[in-house]
Regions:
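Short, hydrophobic beta-strand segments
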Residues: 77-82, 134, 163-169
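Bacterial Sec-dependent N-terminal signal peptides
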Residues: 2-5, 10-42, 97, 102-104, ...
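Short beta-strand edge segments in extracellular beta-sheet folds
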Residues: 104-112, 122, 188-198
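Proline-enriched interdomain boundary motifs that mark the N-terminal boundary
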Residues: 27-35, 110-119
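Surface-exposed binding patches on compact interaction domains or structured appendages
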Residues: 45-76, 135-162
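A short beta-strand micro-motif common to beta-rich folds, especially ectodomain repeats
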Residues: 86-98, 171-184
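Ser/Thr/Gly/Pro-rich, low-complexity flexible regions
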Residues: 192-346
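Short, solvent-exposed loop/linker segments at the N-terminal edge
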Residues: 38-43, 120-126
Length: 346
């Protein structure tokens, strides 16, 4: 009889334990219904929607993700702006005292992408639209100087900005340096409107050979009857002239120009120094002379490229033969060469 009684008690204990486990399971309910945990750089409101029992607590391991509300139905948090280049992650944990769930909060880095080859926008005197590509995570401001707003405006679109340029009837070159900024990032653009014939005249100048700086005096640019241009006295006191064509509203000087006899029995060649510092004689390769606007609003004419792949400078090379096959030496290397009116740079 006692043995049967002990068996009966054992069965009751098992039933009681099972009942306790069922009760505990029902009291520790923590079901996830919906989440919003991925964010752009601009940040925003996130949430974890749930069904739960018990006392809900939440914790996050970074200060840029801030808990706003915690209750049995929802955990709400706010992700701050990310102005950095890199994306970032946070860990959010939710618990009801028995069960715990963990969530990764992901935020992408800030984007400010612009065309590095679009910083110089040169155009003739006709009314025109100059498009540039620009992508930004944040809203950006476009600052056109007050003195240029009468003739220069802009329109934003999904791909970037369209600069709207009115017809130039002033009879002189005009330009503006436009700053575009988003948070702590920015880009500057030069918009210059002019007639290419304004590059003709007599100019002073300066250049570097990579070691020292030198001055230039009375460099002359003339337009020919056939529409081409001649530049003379770039080698001060020597009679050599460089030929150029008007391309993209600049004067383009082709490589490989045979300038003729140099010191009786030698020959002189105009060649281009490429961006990777090779001497180039291919006539299809050119270096351009065009206006650049200084911060004080004045203009200089620069033998400088707009793109990173544009030529680094130009060089006059001495050869033994008229076919320019046997080079002897460099006569002069021109880097960062600019031309200007005498009263511009003192």
């Amino acid at each position: 009889m006692r043995k049967l009684f002990n068996i009966f008690l054992f069965v009751l204990c098992i039933v009681a334990i099972a009942g306790c486990n069922d009760t505990e399971s029902s009291e520790s309910k923590l079901e996830i219904k919906a989440v919003n945990t991925n964010f752009q750089a601009t940040g925003g409101k996130g949430y974890i929607q749930l069904q739960s029992t018990g006392n809900i607590t939440a914790d996050v391991d970074v200060d840029w993700c801030v808990l706003k509300e915690v209750n049995p139905n929802e955990v709400v948090f706010e992700v701050k702006e990310n102005t950095g280049y890199s994306g970032r992650n946070a860990l959010l944990t939710i618990s009801n005292g028995v069960k715990t769930e963990a969530f990764n909060i992901n935020q992408s880095g800030a984007v400010f992408i612009f065309g590095k080859d679009e910083w110089m926008l040169r155009t003739d005197n006709k009314a025109t639209t100059l498009p540039i590509k620009l992508q930004s995570s944040f809203d950006y401001t476009i600052d056109i100087p007050a003195e240029a707003q009468e003739w220069l405006s802009f329109e934003q679109n999904a791909k970037g900005i369209n600069f709207k340029v009115k017809e130039n009837t002033s009879g002189k070159m005009r330009g503006a340096i436009v700053n575009v900024a988003a948070k702590d990032r920015s880009a500057s653009y030069q918009v210059i409107q002019y007639d290419v014939d304004e590059l003709t005249g007599t100019w002073q100048g300066m250049f570097s050979d990579g070691q020292m700086n030198y001055g230039l005096k009375d460099v002359i640019i003339e337009k020919q009857e056939d529409g081409t241009y001649l530049l003379s006295n770039i080698l001060t006191g020597l009679p050599y002239k460089l030929k150029a064509k008007a391309i993209d509203n600049c004067l383009a000087f082709g490589a490989g120009q045979n300038l003729g006899v140099f010191e009786d029995n030698l020959y002189l060649s105009f060649e281009i120094l490429s961006s990777d510092l090779y001497y180039v004689k291919d006539p299809s390769v050119t270096i351009s002379l065009g206006p650049v606007m200084l911060t004080d609003g004045t203009f200089v004419f620069a033998f400088s490229g707009i793109k990173e792949s544009d030529p680094f400078g130009f060089v006059f090379r001495v050869y033994e033969d008229a076919k320019l096959q046997k080079v002897i030496d460099n006569l002069s290397i021109f880097i960062n060469c600019i031309l200007f009116k005498e009263d511009i740079i003192q």
